[in-house]
Amino acid sequence: MNTLKPLIAAAVSLCCVNVYAADSASNAELEARIAKLEGNNAPSQFKNSQVSLYGSIRPTLSYLDDSQDDTWDVRDALSRVGIKASTEFADGWSAIAQGEWSVDIANSGNFGKARQAYAAIASPYGQVGIGKQRPAQYTLVAEYVDIFNHGNSPYAYDHDSPFFVDNFLTYQLVTGNLTWMAGAQFDGDKGDDATDMVNLGVGYDIDNLHIGIGYITQNTADQQGVEGDDKTLGGVVAYTFSNDLYLAVSYQDKQYNYDAGSMNKDRSGSTLDTALAYPIFDDYKIKLGYFQFKDGIKDNTSADYNGFNTTLEWNPVDNVRVHLEYLDKSYDNRDNDHAVTIGFRYDFSLTWHG
């Protein structure tokens, strides 16, 4: 009997040890499975990556007077949504993709045409992109006078200058205070078999000063199919003073040239856009602008115009803007336009890191 009790105690202890060991093994296996599942939630292709979803919704209500009729109209000041992703795959090397589409608030609220759609590789030697992108002429020149809450801003540049270019190959390099940009359009369905447009530009930034220069040469054709080429040389100077006064002036010289046999004559035109912004209270800002467009046509078919706008802007927070604008646009050969607009703008941006 004395021998039996120790044997029973030993058996019970052994069972407990086996159960504990089994539980420990099960726990270790469970933890390993959880770690594996958590790893599956972050696929390797998203490591060292960043994805941003962003947008800007900009409805407006305008009272329009073209000297003959006056109307009220809900319009849109270039609302858009977009997504941008980048992945660093080597030290200083990244792959980038971006898509951005307009939102047609003025009508049914549908997604409109693509504003940007491209892929790029960024490296210490510069960035190369292919697809629909911003040209140097806008990025380095026009953007600095594009401060107004209107779909046609900058008002002179808007008539006959590029905001986005499709079928576009671009290169960009930043060296110190200089930004170099080059782009070439290759559209096999129209224009030359080679390049249809070339845009070169350089920007200089130091402290509160920006100076930008851009040059465009672009293939064109008249209504009879006779080819020609347009050449544009433009520049901008923008400066923010110590009292937060912002002032920018942009000018472009435009040459319209046609080959022999064209009914159109060679001509010279220009665009002038100015922009001023000044904070008057903590959350309020006043904006002023003067603009002038000349197409070089010397008869009554000319679309020459000039004008000005004044804007009072309220920014209660960084991503919310409410504005009241008066726009006056005077044409040489057609009825003048006047508009009073109240508008709202809401910006958002969400970013995920892998």
Language model features by range: what are they?
Residues 2-3, 7, 14-129, 164, ...:
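Beta-barrel outer-membrane channel/assembly domains of diderm bacteria
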Residues 59-65, 101-105, 134-136, 175-177, ...:
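Transmembrane beta-strands of outer-membrane beta-barrel pores
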Residues 73, 156-160, 256:
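Extracellular/periplasm-exposed beta-strand and loop segments of Gram-negative cell-envelope proteins
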Residues 105-111, 160-166, 186-196, 224-229, ...:
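Solvent-exposed loop/turn segments connecting transmembrane beta-strands
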Residues 132, 140-175, 179, 185:
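Solvent-exposed adhesion/ligand-recognition segments of exported proteins
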Residues 146-150, 267, 305, 340-343:
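Flexible, surface-exposed loop regions and adjacent strand-edge segments
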Residues 197-302, 307, 352-354:
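Detector for outer-membrane/organellar transmembrane beta-barrel domains
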